[in-house]
C-alpha cells in the first residue's frame, strides 16, 4: 500500500467530509483504508420506518469503492462516480454495525470498475457495482 503524502491526504479528505462524520463512518483498519469502512445504524441513518435508509448505504458503498481505488490513482488523477447500481438484499435494523468493503475489479486508463458488499452479522445486506471516471485532479 502506498505510504505517500498524496495518499494520506486523500484518505484524510474522505474521512473529513462532514456527511461521513455525521453518519459515524470509520475505517475498518486505520493502517489500510482499502480494507473498507463501517458505520453504526443509529438515528441519523434511519428512514421513517426505523430501518437503515437506502441512501446511506448507497453513499457509503461509493465511499468504500473510492477508498479501494485511491492506491490505483496517480498524484495527478482523481475519480468521480458516473454509475452506481445497488441491490438491497435485506433490511437492516437499528443498533447494528454495517461493514462495507470495496474491491477494484479493473482500472483502465479512463475508467475504473469496482464492486462493494455491505455486511451485517456475517450476511450480505447490499451489493453494488460502481463505475468511476478517472479524471485529471485539479
Model-based region annotation:
Residues 1-138:
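Terminal targeting signals and extreme-terminal segments of soluble enzymes
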Amino acid at each position: 500500500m502506498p505510504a505517500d503524502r498524496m495518499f494520506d491526504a486523500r484518505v484524510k479528505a474522505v474521512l473529513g467530509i462532514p456527511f461521513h462524520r455525521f453518519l459515524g463512518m470509520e475505517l475498518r483498519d486505520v493502517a489500510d483504508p482499502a480494507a473498507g469502512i463501517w458505520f453504526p445504524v443509529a438515528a441519523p441513518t434511519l428512514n421513517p420506518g426505523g430501518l437503515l435508509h437506502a441512501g446511506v448505504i448507497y453513499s457509503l458503498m461509493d465511499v468504500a469503492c473510492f477508498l479501494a481505488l485511491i492506491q490505483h490513482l496517480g498524484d495527478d488523477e482523481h475519480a468521480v462516480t458516473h454509475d452506481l447500481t445497488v441491490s438491497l438484499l435485506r433490511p437492516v435494523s437499528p443498533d447494528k454495525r454495517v461493514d462495507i468493503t470495496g474491491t477494484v475489479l479493473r482500472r483502465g486508463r479512463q475508467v475504473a470498475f469496482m464492486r462493494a458488499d455491505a455486511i451485517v452479522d456475517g450476511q450480505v445486506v447490499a451489493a453494488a457495482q460502481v463505475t468511476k471516471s478517472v479524471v485529471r485532479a485539479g
